């Protein structure tokens, strides 16, 4: 009947808007579509069956070792959000990865791994890093190609897996950790905040230097995504894991 056809058409249009919301800017944040019955004046909003939640980042605690990182895709150059799933098993201190094929991304993951081996005890005192093996699945959640800019998130994820302690809820991490142990200067703060909002993240870890750039960020983004500032990678991990 006519109602079924209308709802089918609106459902298709909403799927398009859901994808635009993920890929594009804040102008696509409102995805609700529906119709008003002229006879009853009743408004009906059409949902998408598979979109029980339109958030990539859930508003609940993730399993220990799982974390979301934000960075530019090394293929499309778009700012994206990625899910890094780390777990530990009994072993001898080796690391294996799945989903990591590009050389620059492998180097980024290795930077996180090297820093983790040297510094995990500063976050989890007394822990024995080399009594475990570490497994990483790097999920390209938006299908844009992997990023080499989420190495800080991977370091935090490794700490979370080893400590068997989840990160705080609805968190994304921004920051590129280099092999030297230093952090790359973070730019495009507003783009990072927008991607986090569109993905459903309520909190974002940012370096202390980003405070000066926050002043220029759209107020609506700041009302939705709470910035949490860190001084260095150790501080970032402690704040992500709520360890003080």
Model-predicted segments: where are they?
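Conserved AAA+ ATPase small/helical "lid" subdomain
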Residues: 1-21, 39-42
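Peripheral, non-AAA+ core regions of ATP-driven protein-machinery
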Residues: 26-244
